[in-house]
UniProtKB/Swiss-Prot annotation:
GO biological process, one term: cell division
UniProt keywords, alphabetically: ATP-binding, Cell cycle, Cell division, Cell shape, Cell wall biogenesis/degradation, Cytoplasm, Ligase, Nucleotide-binding, Peptidoglycan synthesis
Subcellular location: Cytoplasm
Species, as recorded: Hyphomonas neptunium (strain ATCC 15444)
Cell wall biogenesis/degradation among keywords: yes
Assigned protein family: Belongs to the MurCDEF family.
Protein name (record): UDP-N-acetylmuramate--L-alanine ligase
Length: 474
């Protein structure tokens, strides 16, 4: 098999190949001509998709799986004591992080890299959608399933690539984008960074990696990104947001059950009159999603998309799996309007607050029930006070036990202590669920006609959200 390297390097073995990020790397490497194999702890849809492309996937992590591999690729989720990693190092096989391989891949194309604490997956999807609509046909590597593709990956024919970066371990600063998008910067992954100054430095480096012909797209609604914009002195920058001073600004926003409707005001250089793209519709609610759309619109305009192409593509956007995704409806015994069930990946307080604000905008005075499964004890501990105050837009809050994600419990950091803190912060209806198995019966007592149940978390709550309609009807 021909490869994009000047000499044979042997198969690339991807540890955790079924993961959303690693499966995308596998796809693009296959398309480029690399020989790829991998392993994961269990079968999954991504594993089966890769097998259908001819990839050998081992189930279980074992030292013998890496025999004959030319390199081993790992993500931040793979521990140093993983048996395949240990075997590779003992055998002198290079062990490469996902970001390093992504940097190698993106070196060969003009690349739009999306970074930020929140909104990366949706923004990446929107950029891909608008560039597709403009006939640019980029290659796409995303951190979530794009409904239009049925996958987190698309092989494009153009010289452009759109990728979601990963700032969790700082390796996103190794990327060399042509366009660097920064959606927001909040304290997250502080176990790696330690201080906000170190986190800021990583984003500074990410933007400084732009070539002289590249540009940064920065959301100045967020104070940390606005401060970053002020530090960008030798790269071209374009700001976006609701901020009155933004170069690409959303105005006249309204929301209904069909999504967000708004105009975009575009201001170029000093002295140039602003112009507008009017009557845009995004089939997603929430100011945060409009901000994500503004980033995509900015990139599309820079790459030559017409106003008409942008409007049509935005209106047809199919969304991303687990981003305010409707997964069912249930008609209460009282009749009337059905109860809507929403599944969302939000697991950080800022994300939860944004999702619930969007839900409230859609629901008006109808009931919103937030169901939260905290993800990781360490995150709950580090952001405990923020978690205690992010549910104000919900009428009722149900908190399930913490999804451990391999972590050891931390004394005093439980879903019960979170509920007590939510109550102390003034919420009138918050309760702890013994388990998510109790959810259907509790929803039946709280949800009247027209209510919305929003299931939030990065753990297995998505399975319960998907089953909730059937269990309510059963």
């Amino acid at each position: 098999m021909t490869t994009p390297t000047p000499f044979p390097v042997g198969p690339a073995h991807i540890v955790g190949i079924g993961g959303i990020g690693m499966s995308g790397i596998a796809d693009v490497m296959l398309t480029m001509g690399y020989e790829v194999q991998g392993s994961d702890v269990s079968d999954s849809a991504n594993v089966e998709r890769l097998r259908a492309r001819g990839v050998k996937v081992f189930i279980g992590h074992k030292p013998e799986n890496v025999v004959g591999a030319g390199t081993v690729i790992i993500s931040t989720a793979i521990r140093r004591d993983n048996p395949e990693v240990q075997a590779a190092r003992a055998a002198g096989i290079p062990v490469v992080r996902r970001a390093n391989m992504l940097a190698e891949i993106t070196r060969l194309k003009y690349t739009v890299c999306v970074a930020g604490t929140h909104g990366k997956t949706t923004t990446t999807s929107l950029v891909a959608c608008l560039l597709d609509g403009a006939g640019i046909d980029p290659t796409v590597i995303n951190g979530g399933i794009i409904h239009a593709y049925g996958s987190n990956y698309k092989a494009g024919e153009s010289d452009w690539m759109v990728v979601e970066s990963d700032e969790s371990d700082g390796t996103f600063a190794k990327l060399h984008p042509t366009c660097a998008i920064v959606t927001n910067i909040d304290p997250e992954h502080m176990d790696h960074y330690g201080t906000m100054d170190k986190l800021r430095e990583a984003f500074d480096t990410f933007v400084e990696n732009l070539p002289f012909y590249g540009f940064a797209v920065l959301c100045t609604d967020h104070p940390e990104v606005q401060a970053l914009a002020a530090r960008v002195t030798d790269r071209r920058r374009i700001t976006y947001g609701f901020n009155l001073q933004a170069d690409v600004r959303a105005v006249n926003l309204s929301t209904d059950l069909k999504g967000a409707h708004f105009d975009v005001e575009i201001r170029r250089g000093a002295g140039e009159a602003p112009r507008r793209i009017e009557g845009l519709t995004l089939p997603m609610a929430g100011e945060h999603n409009v901000q994500n759309a503004l980033a995509a619109i900015t990139v599309a305009l820079e790459l030559g998309a017409s106003d008409e192409q942008i409007s049509a593509s935005l209106a047809s956007f199919g969304g991303v799996k687990r981003r305010f995704t409707p997964v069912g409806e249930w008609l209460p015994a009282a009749g009337g309007e059905p109860v809507k069930i929403i599944d969302d990946y939000g697991h950080h307080p800022v994300e939860i607050a944004a999702v619930l604000k969007a839900a409230r905008a859609m629901q008006a005075d109808r009931t919103v029930i937030a169901v939260c499964q905290p993800h990781r004890y360490s995150r709950l501990k580090d952001l405990f006070e923020d978690f205690s105050r992010c549910f104000d837009q919900a009428d009722h809050v149900l908190v399930a036990p913490v999804y451990e994600a391999g972590e050891t419990p931390i004394p005093g950091i439980t879903h019960e202590t979170l509920v007590r803190s939510i109550q102390r912060n003034g919420h009138r209806s918050a309760r702890a669920l013994p388990s998510l198995a109790e959810l259907p019966e509790v929803v039946k007592t709280l949800a009247g006609p027209g209510a919305m149940v929003v299931c939030l978390g990065a753990g297995d709550i998505t399975r319960y959200a998907g089953e909730l309609e059937a269990r309510l009807k059963g």
